[in-house]
């Protein structure tokens, strides 16, 4: 967030105050120009309840305006087991009473290897969720159910990253060709994987 001004490389009062000022300026701009728009702060701490709690306590103490919702990133490779996500959702929705989304997540649908994989199979694997189309669908269902169960009426939804990267020719993100191929929700010929269907059912 506009480094170095908004950097929290050190958790000091003045750093939280600086970041709060930046975020509040953004909130005011949205409220003034598009008052019907909803504002979400996106944190990458979906697997770290303690860090999430500390972030909010310090930011609200520094005068941060409450947003309309919070988005959390959750990837098993970096965030650990799903129970970590559950704990963090409880912090956001329970302790702070904020609507919450899993704003970024993914899980491989194949154990095949990529030239430059974003999700490392060895570090991403969760017990009970195979690297297969059905395993990916089970993961999507589980994440949706966890969000709904923990956050209840404060659950916003689940966003997948990256939905449309079906083959090496089309995957053009900066991490390299095919980096996200096996976390896609579509097949190489553009058909929906079971996980996309699962997410659709969960949203109803």
Residue ranges and their predicted role:
Residues 74-79, 129-133:
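Short, surface-exposed loop/turn motifs that are enriched in glycine and acidic residues
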Residues 36-40, 66-71, 99-102, 155-159:
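Structural preference for beta-strand elements that scaffold enzyme active sites
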Residues 1, 42-47, 72-77, 105-108, ...:
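Active-site beta-loop-alpha junctions enriched in small/polar residues
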Residues 1-61, 65, 79-91, 95, ...:
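Active-site cleft segment of glycoside hydrolase catalytic domains centered on the general acid/base Glu
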Residues 64-69, 81-82, 88-117:
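Aromatic-lined glycan-binding groove of carbohydrate-active enzymes
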Residues 4-14, 87, 91-94, 110-204:
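Aromatic-rich peripheral "rim/lid" segments of glycoside hydrolase catalytic domains that contact
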């Amino acid at each position: 967030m506009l480094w170095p001004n908004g950097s929290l490389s050190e958790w000091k009062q003045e750093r939280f105050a600086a970041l709060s000022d930046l975020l509040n300026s953004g909130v005011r701009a949205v409220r003034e120009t598009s008052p019907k728009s909803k504002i979400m702060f996106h944190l990458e701490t979906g697997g770290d309840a303690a860090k999430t709690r500390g972030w909010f306590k310090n930011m609200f103490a520094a005068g941060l305006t409450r947003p309309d919702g919070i988005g959390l990133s959750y990837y098993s490779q970096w965030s650990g087991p799903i129970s970590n996500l559950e704990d963090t959702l409880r912090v956001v929705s329970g302790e702070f009473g904020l609507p919450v989304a899993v704003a970024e997540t993914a899980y491989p649908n194949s154990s095949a290897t990529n030239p430059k994989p974003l999700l490392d199979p060895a570090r991403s694997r969760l017990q009970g969720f195979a690297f297969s189309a059905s395993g990916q669908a089970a993961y999507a269902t589980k994440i949706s159910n966890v969000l709904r169960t923990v956050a209840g009426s404060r659950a916003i939804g689940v966003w997948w990253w990256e939905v449309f990267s079906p083959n090496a020719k089309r995957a053009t993100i900066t991490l390299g060709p095919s980096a996200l191929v096996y976390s896609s929700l579509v097949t190489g010929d553009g058909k929906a994987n079971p996980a996309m269907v699962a997410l659709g059912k969960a949203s109803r």
